């Protein structure tokens, strides 16, 4: 009963729920039109995690728009796939709020990348590409080039022609899978920073090549333990990054490193 979109007007002291679908559906992605802060897009995702597994997708999933700062919402459907949907990722072009992209999980006949040139009133599918969305699924528009589109799911890819064709650069060789966040420098679009299950990677050539940043204390450990050696070793199992062990002491001033 606590799922949905919430709004605060006092810096987070109090919150009001402004969009609610049902107890099985929450908000998974949300963007604001940079040229009109009263225009908001919210992607709702029907998903439930249980002790024995999870269910994802259903008739609760959908894309909504508000033009009055969240007071009222309208579901956007024209041109989008009918029936049950799953994860939806959205982005608005910062230089023209009419241009919106949505990465939609649906059945084989409807999934893919959709484009709107009228603030979401109607949509057309420009690509069937949707790299296994899961709970992470992102689409990002280059803030200085509306034809440059990035997609992140399990895999990562980019397009220079508005989604007609795609390339990966050295992403397959040098990026960890499962991409959650992407930042594009608005002053230099060649500089992009990507967050994935493997940590943080950056590129200075528009995602053609990538550098991974090691030794950041951001790994998600599910369990840790110690062995019986002297000095004892500390071991941990990470999210999609294997298990690591290291001595609990080191003779370097930098501490224990990967």
Predicted regions and their residues:
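Beta-propeller blade termini and top-face loops
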Residues: 1-258
């Amino acid at each position: 009963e606590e799922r949905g979109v919430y709004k605060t007007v006092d810096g987070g002291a109090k919150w009001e729920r402004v969009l609610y679908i049902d107890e099985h559906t929450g908000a998974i992605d949300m963007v604001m039109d940079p040229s009109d802060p009263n225009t908001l897009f919210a992607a709702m995702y029907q998903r439930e995690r249980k002790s024995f597994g999870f269910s994802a997708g259903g008739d609760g999933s959908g894309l909504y728009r508000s033009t009055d700062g969240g007071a009222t919402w309208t579901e956007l459907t024209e041109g989008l796939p009918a029936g049950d949907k799953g994860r939806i990722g959205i982005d608005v072009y910062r230089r023209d709020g009419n241009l919106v992209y949505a990465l939609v999980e649906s059945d084989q006949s409807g999934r893919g990348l959709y484009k709107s040139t009228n603030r979401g009133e109607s949509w057309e599918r420009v690509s069937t590409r949707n790299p296994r969305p899961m709970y992470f699924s992102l689409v990002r528009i280059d803030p200085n080039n509306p034809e440059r589109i990035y997609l992140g799911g399990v895999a990562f890819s980019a397009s220079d022609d508005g989604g007609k064709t795609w390339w990966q650069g050295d992403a397959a060789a040098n990026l960890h899978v499962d991409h959650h966040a992407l930042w594009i420098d608005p002053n230099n679009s060649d500089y992009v920073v990507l967050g994935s299950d493997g940590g943080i990677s950056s590129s200075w050539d528009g995602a053609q090549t990538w550098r991974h940043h090691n030794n950041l204390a951001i790994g998600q450990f599910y369990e840790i333990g110690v062995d019986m050696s002297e000095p004892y070793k500390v071991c941990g199992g990470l999210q999609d990054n294997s298990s690591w062990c290291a001595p609990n002491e080191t003779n370097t001033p930098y501490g224990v490193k990967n």
